[in-house]
Amino acid sequence: MDPLAFRLTNYAEVEPITGKPFSSKGLRECYARGAERFGWSKRPLQPRSTRDDAGLLVGWGVGTATFPALMFQAEARAVIRSDGSGAMEIGAHDMGQGAWTALPQIAADALGLDMAQLEFKSGTSDLPDGGIAGGSAHTATAGMAIHEAGAAVIARLAELATSDQRSPLFGSGNAGVVARGGRLWRRDDDTRSESFADILARAGLSQIDARGKGAADPAAQAAYAMHAHGAVFAEVKVDPDLCQVRVTRLVGAFACGRVINPRMVQSQIYGGMIWGLSFALQEEAVVDHRSGRTINANLGEYHIPVNADVPSLEALMIDEHDPHVNALGIKGVGEIGVTGSAGAVANAIWHATGVRPRRFPVRIEALLDGGPT
């Protein structure tokens, strides 16, 4: 049976363990988009049935990716100043994943400012706790704290304007205005607006501030299963005599909720796919069972890919709206790329050789022992 057809036949419409509905699940579209881009329809069913011009065995495999949409706790402080500019303060840190690009985008949107009007302060413990960067939860957690802080300070600003008879927004109510371009606008009348600077000047204030917290919604978590999903398709080539394996192509399609910065997300996904390839073929922690110590704790013996090991990569992002996971609709992308890639590589090795890998990393000796050339 075709592996993709097998997965679709056994597709889970609800979370199998709890029976909860998914808050959103774009996995079917991930399968469809990834398979189309990869050319999966041309895959022969029988293993060991394809060779390239050099006589290498060629195999195609697919793996399903999933990772829980987690949130921790964070806090942020938002400021609107009398010159119309704003600031967002949060002690979030960036380890290279692009947080200091994505989080200011969320902040600018929350405050209704252009990026040039925003001062983003981060990276120090003097600021409100930004939560941990881990578990594919940082953007959702810190982002929601920023979103809530922005909403709170805009609500304060709106109260100043809508309760003042001198304001063109008088009587609109907080829910009747929206922040955009450094101004508050009436939702029902685009001709009536007032700048942040004018509102604060009339109130005699140099600035206003507010705080917001980011955390998971217990009611939503109780009602829904929240996951990011994806599908990874792999092509490998195997030397029929030496059983050396080389991954030549990886195509992944992922449904991860709202994408804040497409370029950063794609970079995260690429890193995850490379990590999955490394997990499948190279990485292994060797432990001395007498002492419990790791005995290959160095890059000479713990092998990871170099540039020459990385194949052609392609990551497709599926547009997914999730109204339940959080107010921003964000799911994490830090690890979803890892979870399907190793399985896809192992399945491609089976398709190329007829030998089913049962242990990672897949060693040459396992293929030599498992079947003839």
Stretches with model-predicted labels:
Residues 99-106:
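Thiamine diphosphate
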Residues 88-91, 330-332:
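A short, structure-level motif marking secondary-structure boundaries and short turns
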Residues 1-55, 60-63, 106-373:
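C-terminal catalytic domains of large/alpha subunits in multi-subunit enzymes
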Residues 68-70, 84, 94, 242, ...:
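Residues that cap or initiate secondary-structure elements
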Residues 59-90, 97:
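Conserved beta-alpha junction segments in alpha/beta enzyme cores
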